[in-house]
Amino acid sequence: MSTRTVVIEGPERLEGVLHEGAGIGGAVICHPHPLYGGSMWNGVVDAMEEGFSKAGFTTLRFNFRGVGRSTGRFDEGVGETEDLVAACRFLKGVVSGEAGVPACGSMALPVEGVLNPNLAGRSVIAGYSFGAWVASMALARVAWATDLFLVAFPFSSYQTGEIRAFSGRIHLVGGSFDDISPLDDLLALHRDLKGEKRLKVIPASHFFEGHAGEISEFILESFREEEG
């Protein structure tokens, strides 16, 4: 499998990194808050990308506007939602070969030839902290998303209505010592969700120091359970 730097065209020009997977599902991963040093090279984002890649997904991580080589400036989540929609459109084009975007070589495999046939057609929007909120805000604009994977959703700053309205599979990760994403709020959200859902509580703070690998493991566990 190969990894390459890509440019995502949208309202801004965004830098991203595409990793071709062994299956025919795709996962877009959003980084934490740009004004607090968040970028696609964050350690938790690394762990998420590792987990999805090992599960067989083609992954796309990218920098929001104003971060790294991405053009533009921070836009309070409004422009960042547009960035995510553009990234999702780009990855969909890669996976399907639409819109003149070259399809990944592994995407040409028949379903019975992929690492996990049950990932066929699975499309994940994932995010950490601020990126988790942006992921939820984009759901109404990305009709093909089948899964939402949220790490440390910042309940202290943002509402959860879009998450509750999502009809696909929802995967939640939180730290038991997180004061930005309080555990009580996470458990309440998980309890209230009516559809298919998964929860992982890790003994960590908001930054998951020394525990990021548990996020990768949870991704593998979640999707391996759906094999066969």
Predicted regions located by residue number:
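Acidic catalytic loop of the alpha/beta-hydrolase fold
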Residues: 176-181, 207
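Catalytic histidine neighborhood in serine/cysteine hydrolases
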Residues: 193-207
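Short beta-strand/loop motif that positions the catalytic acidic residue
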Residues: 166-167, 171-174, 178
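Serine-hydrolase catalytic machinery in alpha/beta-hydrolase-like enzymes
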Residues: 7-105, 110-111, 116-120
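Catalytic active-site module of serine/aspartate enzymes centered on a nucleophile-bearing elbow/loop
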Residues: 212-228
